[in-house]
Structures are given as structure tokens and as C-alpha cells.
């Protein structure tokens, strides 16, 4: 039986344009990975979003989106709209914030207590380069060799949420005010029955692990000497007063990588993170395990959580405590973190009510499976004349992936780096029908395209940075993801 009943849906249409309906079934013999595999076999263009908090506890829900209604691909001020059964449509867009916000507002929906938060919305990515739509001085990007769009978002009205608390699957469908309610409600019941049959008939196939040699070759898009020279050049700009901090990077690639979803499975196993995501669309796939929120908006509260400062976990409890104190007392890490908190306050302040921006946590230590980070929490109240996407674009890209001052740092990054960043340093997440937004920074992320896997990583450079150390930091950050690819090749 669907919830809410058809009579309640009708009442809700007095205030909302879209109403989600829910169907629950027990799935205690199924994992989220099996759920995704089952649905991915039956439906095109699925995604999975999951979360593990810093106490290594799974977030309550894993979300699998199925059968998107349409896709919006933004590139060079043109949105290509792809919808099943229709010819592609191209729309010239001067203001992408207004374009995508209008879609969400056209699906305004209520929030139901005791049901999954994400019931439908736009899910996908915005590239690092989105800022070029609003900062006209950033007009000389490096070579765009990967040819990714500036944004790729799918409109999902069908989601299956796996409840880790009750071991139930919650099938979520959306009914629009413009639909014939009685017809659509019956159709929703039919779709739920079809999804239930698909799930019940699924027979997972156990793979036999491969006993193969580790033959994965990794290469960078620049030499070590080039990276060291970039750090030295960045320090010159800092010395001259152009910037205080900057985040140069390098991009690694692997030919003939293993299956992209197997890589996701290894990432969630070896790097459990607050933001875990996988999607495969058109000619590319993305698998990520990001530790860092970019921005979230809920009930007009805007939050960003800068992470800057990292040290490895200790092998013992005592070593872990020593490492924590070393991180907290490192003057370079503290100075860099403070700069990025100030940048976050400035970014949030652009869209928040005057006087509402506060730092609710300052330089606390959060522990993850292999490292611990310095993290701060910056909050504000979204102004009445601003939309959640305004908050996203005020922060994108994060200062932790660009530098401070942000625009000047990005101009220098364009000068130093040989290829356009694209997904790296951009954001992955969702814009929900209820008006909430939750996005992370696209780091610890693999892009699969052209039969290659691409992993990009960098590190913050300040006045006293040691080039060799910065090079090693970028390699170490990438290695966590590269190791997951190596392990996935054995599945």
C-alpha cells in the first residue's frame, strides 16, 4: 500500500507542485550494493549515494536513483535537454542558477517525517569551471582535453532508499500536480509492484577473485620537475602579495581500468567517507569517496565545512593522540586552515542575512579510517532573495581546492596547470524537490572516460611550503584512490 493515501495527496497539492509517495518492503537479505546491481540491470542511468560519518557509522539511507525523467547537460551557456522518446532540445542559458532553480521550484514538494530525506530532484555534478560563468576574468582556461560539460544533472522522480536501521527498501515515486491524480496514483502502484518483482527475482552472482599480477601503470600529466617548478612559481606569487595560499594539482591516469562499479565498491570499503557516490552516464562514469562537504542548505540554513590540515592515523591509541596533538599544534596547518575558514565565511556571507554567519566549530579534529583532519563549521541564514543554488555558486569551487583570494588563485592555477580541471574540485550532490541541497567537493574521485581512469590531487601551498613535500602530498592523496583501483582489478 502506498503512503500517503490518494486523498492526502490531493490535499497536499493545495500547497505543493509535487508529492512523493512511498512503498516499503523488508530487504534484510540484501545489501545496498546488491540493490544497486539489481536495479542497474533493469533500469538505465542509475546512481547510488551513500554516507559514512567520522565515527565509521553508516548514514541511515543509501539512495539508488532509477530511470531518470530527463538529463540536463550544460556546456558553454547551452543546456542540452535529453528526454526519452523526444528529440534533444538545446536551450541558450545566460543564468544557469535561474534555469536549474526554476526546475526545482516547478517540483516543490513536502518533507515527510520518518521517511527518507531525498525523495527526488536533480542529481549529478557541477564542474570546477562553473565559476567562469560569473567571474569574467577567468577567461583563459587550459586545454580541455577530457571534454566534460560544465554540469550534468539528471532529474530523478524514482528513487529506492535502503534503510540501514530497519533493513527495508523504500520505493519513492513522485506525482506532479499537472498529472491526472487517479491515473498517476494507480500507475505508481503498478511501478512499485514492478520494482518489487525485480528485487525479489534478483539472484546475485558471486565473482571469483582474480589471482592476477598487479600490472596497473600510473602516469601523471606533468613531470615531477614541472610540479616542483609550479610550487616555486606559486610561492613567488605569494611573496609578491598576489595570494596567501594556492592549491596546484596533477592528474594521474590509468589505461584499461577495471570495472568502474568495482572501483566504487573498493572505495567504499577502503575509504568509507561522508560522501560516497557512483553514477554512469553516456560516455563516462564517476566513483568517489569524498570527505568534504562543499555546501548544504536545509530550511534556509547554509553550511560549509572547510577541511584543511591532515595527518595519518596512529597505529595505536597513544600514537593516534600524539598525531592529533601534532596536527593541532602545527603552525603551518593552523595558518592555512584559518585562511580557508575566513574564505568560507566570506563566501557564505555573500548569500546570507547580515550578521548571521558564524563559525560553530573551529579547528576540531575528525577521524577517518586512515587519516584525521582539521575541520571547521561555518553557518549562515540564506537571504530571502537568494536560492539554494546561489549558495552553491557562492562557494564553488571551495577555497580548499583553489586558494585565497580565490579568483586570483584560480587565475594562477590556469597559468600553471596544463589541462582544464573539469570534475576535480567541482561538486557532486543533489538539489532536492523539497528545496534542500547537499553537495561535496569532488576529491578522492575517479573519472572513467576514453577507456582510462583519471585521478587528480593537489595540496595547499603557502609561503613556507617545501616543494618536495607538496609533491609527495599530492601523490599520497592520489594513492588512496589508485590503490582502490588496483584492488578492484582483482575482483
Named regions from a protein language model:
Residues 1-491:
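Extended alpha-helical targeting/anchoring segments
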Amino acid at each position: 500500500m502506498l503512503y500517503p493515501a490518494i486523498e492526502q495527496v490531493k490535499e497536499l497539492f493545495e500547497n505543493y507542485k509535487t508529492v512523493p509517495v512511498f512503498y516499503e518492503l523488508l530487504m534484510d537479505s540484501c545489501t545496498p550494493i546488491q540493490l544497486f546491481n539489481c536495479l542497474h540491470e533493469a533500469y538505465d542511468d542509475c546512481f547510488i549515494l551513500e554516507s559514512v560519518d567520522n565515527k565509521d557509522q553508516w548514514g541511515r539511507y543509501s539512495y539508488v536513483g532509477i530511470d531518470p525523467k530527463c538529463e540536463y547537460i550544460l556546456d558553454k551557456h547551452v543546456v542540452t535537454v535529453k528526454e526519452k522518446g523526444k528529440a534533444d532540445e538545446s536551450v541558450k542559458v545566460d543564468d544557469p542558477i535561474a534555469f536549474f532553480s526554476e526546475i526545482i521550484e516547478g517540483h516543490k514538494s513536502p518533507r515527510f517525517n520518518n521517511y527518507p530525506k531525498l525523495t527526488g530532484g536533480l542529481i549529478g555534478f557541477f564542474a570546477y569551471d562553473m565559476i567562469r560563468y560569473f567571474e569574467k576574468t577567468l577567461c583563459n582556461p587550459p586545454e580541455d582535453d577530457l571534454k566534460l560539460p560544465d554540469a550534468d544533472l539528471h532529474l530523478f522522480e524514482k528513487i529506492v532508499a535502503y534503510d540501514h536501521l530497519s533493513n527495508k527498501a523504500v520505493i519513492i515515486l513522485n506525482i506532479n500536480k499537472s498529472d491526472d491524480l487517479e491515473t498517476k496514483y494507480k500507475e505508481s502502484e503498478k511501478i512499485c509492484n514492478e520494482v518489487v518483482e525485480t528485487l525479489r527475482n534478483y539472484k546475485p552472482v558471486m565473482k571469483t577473485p582474480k589471482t592476477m599480477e598487479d600490472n596497473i601503470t600510473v602516469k601523471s600529466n606533468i613531470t615531477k620537475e614541472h610540479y616542483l617548478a609550479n610550487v616555486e612559481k606559486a610561492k613567488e606569487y605569494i611573496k609578491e602579495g598576489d595570494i596567501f595560499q594556492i592549491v596546484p594539482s596533477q592528474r594521474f591516469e590509468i589505461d584499461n581500468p577495471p570495472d568502474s562499479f568495482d572501483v566504487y565498491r573498493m572505495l567504499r570499503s577502503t575509504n568509507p567517507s561522508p560522501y560516497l557516490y557512483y553514477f554512469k552516464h553516456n560516455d563516462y562514469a564517476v566513483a568517489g569517496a569524498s570527505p568534504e562537504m562543499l555546501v548544504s542548505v536545509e530550511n534556509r540554513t547554509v553550511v560549509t565545512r572547510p577541511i584543511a590540515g591532515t595527518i595519518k592515523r596512529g597505529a595505536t591509541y597513544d600514537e593516534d593522540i600524539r598525531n592529533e596533538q601534532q596536527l593541532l599544534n602545527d603552525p603551518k596547518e593552523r595558518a592555512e586552515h584559518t585562511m580557508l575558514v575566513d574564505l568560507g565565511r566570506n563566501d557564505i556571507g555573500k548569500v546570507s542575512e547580515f550578521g548571521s554567519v558564524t563559525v560553530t566549530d573551529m579547528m576540531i579534529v575528525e577521524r577517518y579510517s586512515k587519516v584525521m583532519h582539521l575541520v571547521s563549521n561555518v553557518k549562515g541564514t540564506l537571504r530571502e532573495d537568494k536560492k539554494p543554488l546561489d549558495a552553491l555558486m557562492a562557494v564553488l569551487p571551495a577555497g580548499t581546492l583553489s586558494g585565497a583570494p580565490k579568483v586570483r588563485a584560480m587565475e594562477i592555477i590556469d597559468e600553471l596547470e596544463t589541462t582544464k580541471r573539469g570534475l576535480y574540485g567541482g561538486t557532486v550532490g543533489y538539489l532536492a524537490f523539497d528545496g534542500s541541497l547537499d553537495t561535496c567537493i569532488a576529491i578522492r574521485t575517479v573519472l572513467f572516460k576514453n577507456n582510462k581512469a583519471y585521478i587528480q590531487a593537489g595540496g595547499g601551498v603557502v609561503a613556507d611550503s617545501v616543494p618536495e613535500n607538496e609533491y609527495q602530498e599530492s601523490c599520497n592523496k592520489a594513492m588512496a584512490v589508485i590503490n582502490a583501483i588496483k584492488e578492484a582489478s582483482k575482483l
